[in-house]
Amino acid sequence: VMFPIMDGKGRVVGFGGRVMDDSTPKYLNSPECQIFEKGKILFAFDKAYKSIREEKQAILVEGYMDVISAHNKGVTNVVASLGTAYTKDHGHILMRQADEIILAYDMDGAGRQAVTRAIELLQNTDFKVRVLAMPDGKDPDDYVRNHGGKAFKELVEKAVKPLDYLLSESLIK
């Protein structure tokens, strides 16, 4: 399955592909070039920025399907970092629209590490940051498809402060 990757103005700057079987790599993006730098693009920002501005909140997820499922169920302030790497450039994109960032990455090993790195990058910013630890190790796509947009919004309301998340993570280890 191929996904067009657009810049903030809705112009196609690259493509992302996802295999539908168990082969690897699971995702493959266009190579980085002058118009496509993965760390400077938020997937679906061109569609989400109005909702982000209205709600003053951006929900940051990892991948295409997380965003698409959320938007299809009416949760339209969701964007993806195209993997697990949140960057300062992502923050610059969001700072004009949002006061709060909800980190809603997958709760696998890579996702947990990415949340910790994102918390570090966000700690000296003006953003209010909360972390949504998806229940039962699910990713946002699975959760939204199985429970719906309203349930996802309710889950977002229960997102915790970064320190609470980090403390709970240290207790798990």
Protein language model annotation of sequence segments:
Residues 75-78, 118-121, 146-149:
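Short secondary-structure boundary/capping segments
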Residues 4, 105-109, 154, 173:
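Generic amphipathic alpha-helical segments used as scaffolds and interaction surfaces in large
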Residues 100, 106-107, 150:
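Histidine- and aromatic-rich ligand-binding microenvironments
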Residues 93, 120-127:
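Arginine/glycine-rich "motif VI" loop of SF2 helicases in the C-terminal RecA-like domain
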Residues 65, 86, 105-115, 133, ...:
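Acidic, metal-coordinating catalytic cores used for nucleic-acid/nucleotide bond scission
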Residues 1-97, 101, 114-115:
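Phosphate-handling DNA/RNA-contact segment within nucleic-acid enzymes
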Residues 113, 117-118, 123, 169-173:
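Electropositive, surface-exposed helix/loop patches at the edges of structured domains
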